[in-house]
Amino acid sequence: QTLLNKDIKLASPSTLCRLENNIPLETNFENQKILVDTFINSHDAPPKSLTLDFDPTDTTLYGDQEGKHYHGYYRDYCYLPLIVTCDQHLLVAHLRPSNIDGAKHVWAILSLLVKRIRQFWPNTEIIFRADSGLCRHKMLNWCEDNHIKYIVGLPGNSVLNTLSNFFKLHFFCPK
């Protein structure tokens, strides 16, 4: 409330719960924009390069919380928030249920971040970094079309496994 200069009366935990579940999407964007603008304003000069780290992470839930789902990878009931950082700066913290594709919202958030950063620093190199769970072909094509470099993990597949075995055999195993 203080951050956005909005006066909303809160009476009880149930009111808080209703408030959290009914926040307009625009308000969430305003909150995230404050984080990004604070990051931008913390620089005296445009950086030569920025690496945006995208990381979905599990937040284990206890009890009967709204929106709780079991996630097979984490083997627990959890939320799956998407965190975006650049160096030590938090740029985005997006709470999501765990019954979705971990890459959901990544492309949209990356696009909004790139647009905002380039408004202030049009010549700064932007690098998208994420693990294999966020690697999507169309998004990487978008990165290339928009001059965004990327460092992403690739999910295992037969071609990578064959190449990996070749390199292990010929370059990493002592003879």
List PLM regions with ranges:
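Domain-level cores of phosphate- or acyl-group-handling catalytic modules
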Residues: 100-159
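An anionic, glycine-rich sequence signature occurring as long contiguous blocks
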Residues: 149-175
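Generic beta-strand/beta-sheet core signal
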Residues: 55, 85, 93, 129-131, ...
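Electropositive, glycine- and tryptophan-enriched low-complexity nucleic-acid-binding patches
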Residues: 72-121
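Short, glycine-/Ser/Thr-/acidic-enriched flexible segments
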Residues: 57-59, 89, 97-98, 155-157
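Short, positively charged, Gly/Tyr-enriched micro-motifs
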Residues: 1-34, 84-91, 110, 118-119, ...
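Short acidic, glycine/serine/threonine-rich loops at helix termini
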Residues: 61-67, 91-96, 137-142, 161-167
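Active-site-proximal, Lys/Arg-enriched surface segment
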Residues: 8-9, 13-82
